[in-house]
Amino acid sequence: MALRSDYEHGRADSYRVATVIATDDDNRTADGQYKSRRKMPAKVNKKENLDDLKQELDIDFHKISPEELYQRFQTHPENGLSHAKAKENLERDGPNALTPPKQTPEWVKFCKNLFGGFAMLLWIGAILCFVAYSIQASTSEEPADDNLYLGIVLSAVVIVTGIFSYYQESKSSKIMESFKNMVPQFATVIREGEKLTLRAEDLVLGDVVEVKFGDRIPADIRIIEARNFKVDNSSLTGESEPQSRGAEFTHENPLETKNLAFFSTNAVEGTAKGVVISCGDHTVMGRIAGLASGLDTGETPIAKEIHHFIHLITGVAVFLGVTFFVIAFILGYHWLDAVIFLIGIIVANVPEGLLATVTVCLTLTAKRMASKNCLVKNLEAVETLGSTSTICSDKTGTLTQNRMTVAHMWFDNQIIEADTTEDQSGVQYDRTSPGFKALSRIATLCNRAEFKGGQDGVPILKKEVSGDASEAALLKCMELALGDVMNIRKRNKKIAEVPFNSTNKYQVSIHETEDTNDPRYLLVMKGAPERILERCSTIFINGKEKVLDEEMKEAFNNAYMELGGLGERVLGFCDFMLPSDKYPNGFKFNTDDINFPIDNLRFVGLMSMIDPPRAAVPDAVAKCRSAGIKVIMVTGDHPITAKAIAKSVGIISEGNETVEDIAQRLNIPVSEVNPREAKAAVVHGAELRDVSSDQLDEILRYHTEIVFARTSPQQKLIIVEGCQRMGAIVAVTGDGVNDSPALKKADIGVAMGIAGSDVSKQAADMILLDDNFASIVTGVEEGRLIFDNLKKSIAYTLTSNIPEISPFLAFILCDIPLPLGTVTILCIDLGTDMVPAISLAYEHAEADIMKRPPRDPFNDKLVNSRLISMAYGQIGMIQAAAGFFVYFVIMAENGFLPKKLFGIRKMWDSKAVNDLTDSYGQEWTYRDRKTLEYTCHTAFFISIVVVQWADLIICKTRRNSIFQQGMRNWALNFGLVFETVLAAFLSYCPGMEKGLRMYPLKLVWWFPAIPFALAIFIYDETRRFYLRRNPGGWLEQETYY
């Protein structure tokens, strides 16, 4: 079994691989240099370019000898390039800078918002209004202003909605700007033997550069000289532990070898000299930037739904408008009347306030999510998260606490579990045994980590530490167990130290002890367990020193295997009291030419560390599973560690085996196991390199629980694309620059607010402010709820379309005076219906929405045929009946019985007729008739408001009874009051008869619509009763939207 220890592997293989991209041979000149970017064809096939970027890096600059390197780049280690050669290279390759992607001009984006979707229909309506008004103005002495006002209102609606949408869109996509912030400004270069400070963008291939502590690496360089040089690759890899760099070639993989340093990473220690091997877009960082900014993300699920809905409604509006325009013509109407009628049909069909309602609903949910640590950058992402069917989660910091913690100890021949919980509420162990005291003394003294200053009130686990992650874990563990570690170190003064190095794989220090009766020096050592064990001849067990025999070695091996198998990083500890006769007080210890014993020591025990899971994660993963969401771990960490964490958080559930587990259980080779028998899979990045997209699809299809370990960022991107090929809606979490391509490609990218790089935050749609996976689950719940509530909101809004359209149809087909005007329709769509529709966004979930599978984007539409059938064919019809009932009542009260109204329209609308007789023989002037008509418009409008009360209440729930759901939504209760008050204001406010042609109504005219409102309530309550009684039955298939 591959065991891991800090010391055994060094750091090179245990940090996450950075994103890199292949450079095929046809992309280079004969001497291995890159071809000029300037001479590339004007149009590069974008898909081929991106496919090239997705390949792993394939270069040999780190393998060749320094002499071959200088020859290839025509440079010299001491003199650098000549000025002429540098100028030639600069002209050939262009500047050492990232090329920004082509942007869509802002005015084009603005025009798309101003003329897309419903907007085009409303513009046509507005233009028709202005045309009709101008014709009326030229043919009539006193033209009516209705069409002018209507045209102005429609134009205003379109412009305001367009500006609103444009503002929302313009806030996103600034990925490239955040990459630019990472680019260093200046670099120290040697040219013709002279040191120069140049702008970083003037560097060229073959330049010899010098970097020191605090600098940013100005290009990808091959290191030729180094002194204690360390770099922080976290901007590329997300792993912040410093990596040592030097001139030696140590690894085939260019990202893991010590002799390469990469553009935009930080030098944190020492100095180095190197030769520039890649510039600008060809650097590792440049390629990530190219990949992240070049990926086409496509539409969000909710945007697709809204476009589908817009096409549906637009189709209905155009079909009805044109059909009845033609019918009006055939029936002999004047073409101008037919145009006015066409405007009415369009205005009545288009829910003008709906896009604003959707945006406001999403904004409200985004605010609610922000209070739960989910900051949404792109509003449409709110719903996307609810549709998510697969989450590809990073491990470090998202599933885990992002701090190495001591998990187990082995002393006195037993494994002791340490407390890894965030609040120290876990297991306790005996801290009084001699074995623990000896082990804790070594861990305290043989440790260079220290707490940073000025953290007095901060809990121990939250304190910042200067030092290596493993040593920081030991320091915090000892501080919790023993108290003030710094004080213990003062009392046991350090005399000499041999720091850890990758050759010896141990660290030794010698101390004076606090025991005044014992003048001897204490030697303490820690390091890779097997290296420590081979330097020991005795072992300390239960307070006694015993000979380290084969039995004890086997016990050690078993413990080491067990802890290593848990994916933990294991360290061994030993000590030795130096005899005072050989090493008297004041002895000069020489750490270069060692003059003290480092063999025949006393072995004391092991300590193992892991970055433990966050407390809330197992529960969150279980919630995802019950919600039908597949959680895949994608990490750059070691497979054993990844599998251990996956098991502890439930990504690999208990009892589910991988191919390797089955082979081990049956004691057969792995090749003999049928992969489909294994529900779980741990896939190594190296295997992924050789896997075709079909094989990847098979892994994703047949394994329900998957861990991808040791993956590079392109592989993360390829995994995301694989999931999307399977039809999944994919959420991806990440924090490093290297994660940005996958974050951008995913349906929803989730970046980390605390540990995340600026680039990952720009590429993402959502930011977790607390870096906690559990917050994603909250987001999923909110996303599902908003989809349900948007359906309710749209059902409510669309229902009033029927009572708005039917008056125009009756006007044409039955030849009656117009029952409802176009301006009045706008008062409903942009006035009384807006607040109630938005209030449905506050509605609570009907049942446990996290117990159902994710929404199928192909079949479960925001607006489906069942919703249209309910809104238009059932509830809308009852509402239209209410409106016509009120219309006929008022007409009859004023002398026009229903029979008299049919066929009267031409006479009614003629200004020349001032003696039209009603059913009782009274004569009506044109002005009196119009006053009565506008009073009917107002009454029809009020009747729609009254039946919309019932519609709002029934839209609260799609399955539950209203009595079960209750009226706890105070926003909705306010909406009921608001629409009533607004309707009354529009009817009774002085001056409205001139502005909106709305007249005061008798109080009794509010009542005829109430029985219809009750009918709607009773009808729908009965429908839902039968829905609950017969789940999946005919009624559900026909009416459950």
UniProtKB/Swiss-Prot annotation:
UniProt key word Nucleus: no
Tissue expression remark: High levels are found in some adult tissues: Malpighian tubules, indirect flight muscles, tubular leg muscles and throughout the nervous system (brain, optic lobes, retina and ventral thoracic neuromere). Lower levels are detected at the posterior end where the reproductive organs and rectum are located.
Active site location: 394 (4-aspartylphosphate intermediate)
Keywords in alphabetical order: ATP-binding, Cell membrane, Ion transport, Membrane, Nucleotide-binding, Phosphoprotein, Potassium, Potassium transport, Sodium, Sodium transport, Sodium/potassium transport, Translocase, Transmembrane, Transmembrane helix, Transport
GO molecular function terms listed in the Swiss-Prot or TrEMBL record: ATP binding; ATP hydrolysis activity; P-type sodium:potassium-exchanging transporter activity
Regions crossing the membrane: 115-135, 147-167, 312-332, 338-358, 808-828, 870-890, 935-955, 970-990
Record CDD domains: P-type_ATPase_Na-K_like
S-S bonds: none
Enzyme Commission designation: 7.2.2.13
Topology relative to the membrane: Multi-pass membrane protein
Keyword Transmembrane helix annotated: yes
Binding site for ATP: 526
Pfam families reported in the protein's UniProt record: Cation_ATPase, Cation_ATPase_C, Cation_ATPase_N, E1-E2_ATPase, Hydrolase
GO cellular component, one term: sodium:potassium-exchanging ATPase complex
Protein location: Cell membrane
Gene3D superfamilies associated with the record: Calcium-transporting ATPase, cytoplasmic domain N, Calcium-transporting ATPase, cytoplasmic transduction domain A, Calcium-transporting ATPase, transmembrane domain, HAD superfamily/HAD-like
Reaction(s) catalysed by this chain's protein: K(+)(out) + Na(+)(in) + ATP + H2O = K(+)(in) + Na(+)(out) + ADP + phosphate + H(+)
A GO biological process held by the record: regulation of tube diameter, open tracheal system
Biological role: This is the catalytic component of the active enzyme, which catalyzes the hydrolysis of ATP coupled with the exchange of sodium and potassium ions across the plasma membrane. This action creates the electrochemical gradient of sodium and potassium ions, providing the energy for active transport of various nutrients.
UniProt-listed NCBIfam families: ATPase-IIC_X-K, ATPase_P-type
Family: Belongs to the cation transport ATPase (P-type) (TC 3.A.3) family. Type IIC subfamily.
Note in the entry: Ouabain-sensitive electrogenic ion pump.
Subunit-level organization: The sodium/potassium-transporting ATPase is composed of a catalytic alpha subunit, an auxiliary non-catalytic beta subunit and an additional regulatory subunit.
Stated name of the protein: Sodium/potassium-transporting ATPase subunit alpha
Gene from which the chain derives: Atpalpha
